[in-house]
Amino acid sequence: MSNKKDVAVKISGGKKIREAREKVKSDALYNLTNAVERLKSASYVKFDPTLEIVMKFGIDPRHSDQMVRGVVNLPAGTGKTVRVAVICKEEREEEAKSAGADLVGSTNIIDEIKAGKINFDVCIATPDMMAVIGSVARILGPKGLMPNPKLGTVTLDIKNAIKNAKSGQVEYRAEKAGIIHAGLGKLSFSDQDLLKNLNAFIEAVIKAKPAGLKGSYLKAMYLSSTMGASVQIDLTSIA
């Protein structure tokens, strides 16, 4: 049975949610600057939420020529600690460790993956290790962790790949419904830093438009914060 203190907390929490929602008009369109300001003022959670973007495109990712996928280096980073695993031959392990890799090795990492122990956010591999990694492709692939040369995670330049992963590189990939979703920093970032990240991400995804696509590309865009409000962006305000 709830006591008076529990009831008071629930009422207080509900009031904060209502007040937050009142600060955002559900039927309004915002430019990026106003959207960031509104989301900050409407946030009520006690942790540092992530600024999230959802973009709806007029594509059908089931067709290979309409797949939209790539990576973006966010100027202000993501605000998250990224654990990087590097799968390489023994002679390059020290280089990977010196560059900041959290996990380094070859068959030892493969064995951990097979055992269900995936303690990393990004997996980087040298080209000569791809045959070995193929044995865990069905495990890493669905999790978005399979090294890919198009994403810069299959490379001879281990140092730069680790630097990019650690400094705020974000991968994007269109889902079945033509939707791309990504986290672009913490709401505690300055407005300027969040806008830098937003502009860099939006520019990269728009440039990734499939060459043979007919009709409009970007259909809708929304910004939100973790457990917070969502606002729709006025596409005419996107340069």
From Swiss-Prot:
CDD domains registered for this protein in UniProt: Ribosomal_L1
Keyword terms: Repressor, Ribonucleoprotein, Ribosomal protein, RNA-binding, rRNA-binding, Translation regulation, tRNA-binding
Annotated Pfam families: Ribosomal_L1
GO cellular component: large ribosomal subunit
Keyword Transferase: no
Highest taxon listed in the record's lineage: Bacteria
Xref: InterPro entries: Ribosom_uL1_bac-type, Ribosomal_uL1, Ribosomal_uL1-like, Ribosomal_uL1/biogenesis, Ribosomal_uL1_3-a/b-sand, Ribosomal_uL1_CS
GO MF annotation list: rRNA binding; structural constituent of ribosome; tRNA binding
Gene Ontology biological process: regulation of translation; translation
Record's subunit section: Part of the 50S ribosomal subunit.
The family this protein is said to belong to: Belongs to the universal ribosomal protein uL1 family.
Role of this protein: Binds directly to 23S rRNA. The L1 stalk is quite mobile in the ribosome, and is involved in E site tRNA release.
Full protein name: Large ribosomal subunit protein uL1
Gene: rplA
